[in-house]
Curated annotation (Swiss-Prot):
It comes from Ralstonia nicotianae (strain ATCC BAA-1114 / GMI1000) (Ralstonia solanacearum). The gene is alr. InterPro entries: Ala_racemase, Ala_racemase/Decarboxylase_C, Ala_racemase_C, Ala_racemase_N, Ala_racemase_pyridoxalP-BS, PLP-binding_barrel. PANTHER family: ALANINE RACEMASE, ALANINE RACEMASE, CATABOLIC-RELATED. Pathway: Amino-acid biosynthesis; D-alanine biosynthesis; D-alanine from L-alanine: step 1/1. The modification N6-(pyridoxal phosphate)lysine is found at residue 35. Its cofactor is pyridoxal 5'-phosphate. This is Alanine racemase. Signal peptide: none annotated. Catalyzes the interconversion of L-alanine and D-alanine. May also act on other amino acids.
Length: 375
């Protein structure tokens, strides 16, 4: 028998979360962002739950080819664009929309011998300072793009840096509107946070990512309560041993946790080699939440490669084989990530290849077929 750990991808949750996005941005089309192997969920698995999107946004050509091989005939957006002139042959072959964020890409398009026009999203750097033309240079970039015969539709695009925080989007939205004033074309601005909380930025296309997978853009689980979003991944395992400790007994590498009174602990088949955060705390008043038999308890001691240890004070009847939820249904991934000093995005993407993945089909209420290992 394999180790009892597994990840479950909840297809119905993906369907639900896309519907939540549509309720928030009813007048916009939706790019469902599936970069980073669909945030660790697997492109092939996520596709089934998100196929009612208007288009898919992803990062590289390999992901785009995989999506076409699944049968998707709609729009696909390369969020970072292309990198080399030879990439344009695949952009054309697979009918991809590409982000264009620099003069070098415009020159490559100008020199390319394309059979037909390529749709682009021309990116403005309104404050993120990663990719995009400066607002003062944007109009010239747009004029350059419009003059290139190999370019068809041009959509105005930017990315918000503070849509999930107190600074908000006003400064970037003002820069975007000034840079695009009087220019024809659709617009795509909103990431997950702006999709939820800034309706005036929805425009023609929204680009939700992490909310499609049921996590919060802020990293705070409470911030998405009441939205209807559901976790699309549950990482679960079982107790594989139980230990009774006396006062003074220590737990794990470095003996960071010491029992102050008689206590029972459970050993869970899950460790950092499975993608659980090694830096998740379990000592000195800082503890990471875990569910055992559906009851909330805490991790104690350090995370090791293959195991963690949990306090069974709240579940005294737990025995070997008791179910354990590391994150997902019943325990928001953002709570675990917050305890570990990171964000839910990272935990999703860090799911290790050795963890078996089971898929709950998008049209079913019960857990479904196993599609192998996490890619």
């Amino acid at each position: 028998m394999p180790r009892p750990i597994q990840a479950v991808i909840h297809g119905p949750a993906l369907v639900n979360n896309l519907q939540v996005v549509r309720r928030h941005a009813a007048d916009s089309r939706v790019w469902a962002v599936i970069k980073a192997n669909a945030y660790g969920h697997g492109i092939e698995r996520a596709y089934e739950g998100l196929r009612q999107a208007d288009g898919f946004g992803l990062l590289d050509l390999d992901e785009a080819v995989r999506l076409r091989q699944l049968g998707w005939q709609g729009p696909i957006l390369l969020l970072e664009g292309f990198f080399k002139p030879e990439d344009l042959a695949l952009v054309e072959q697979y009918r991809l929309t590409t982000t264009v964020h620099c003069e070098e890409q415009l020159r490559m398009l100008e020199l390319a011998r394309l059979k037909g026009p390529v749709s682009i999203q021309l990116k403005i750097n309104t404050g993120m300072s990663r990719l995009g033309f400066a607002p003062a240079a944007y109009r010239a970039a747009w004029e350059h793009a419009r003059a290139i015969s190999g370019i068809g539709t041009i959509v105005h695009m930017t990315h918000f840096s503070d849509a999930d925080g107190p600074r908000g989007i006003d400064h970037q939205l003002a820069a975007f509107e000034q840079a695009t004033q009087g220019l024809p074309g659709e617009a795509s601005l909103s990431n997950s946070a702006a999709t939820l909380w800034h309706p005036r930025a929805h425009r023609d296309w929204v680009r939700p990512g992490v909310i499609l997978y049921g996590a919060s853009p802020t990293g705070v689980a409470a911030d998405i309560e009441g939205t209807g979003l559901m976790p699309a991944m549950t990482l679960k395992s079982e107790l594989i041993a139980v230990q009774d400790l006396q006062p003074g007994a220590t737990v794990g590498y470095g003996s960071r946790f010491e029992a102050e009174q008689p206590m029972r602990i459970g050993i869970v088949a899950c460790g950092y080699a499975d993608g659980y955060p090694r830096h998740a705390p379990g000592w000195d008043g800082n503890y990471t939440p875990v569910l055992v038999d559906g009851v909330r308890t805490r991790m104690v001691g350090r995370v090791s490669m293959d195991m963690i240890t949990v306090d069974l004070a709240e579940v005294p009847g737990a025995r070997v084989g008791a179910p354990v939820t590391l994150w997902g249904q019943g325990l928001p991934i953002d709570e675990v990530a917050h305890a570990a000093g990171t964000v839910g995005y990272e935990l999703m993407c860090a799911l290790a290849p050795r963890v078996p993945v089971t898929v709950e089909p998008a049209g079913a209420a019960d857990a479904g077929e196993t599609l192998g290992k996490a890619a």
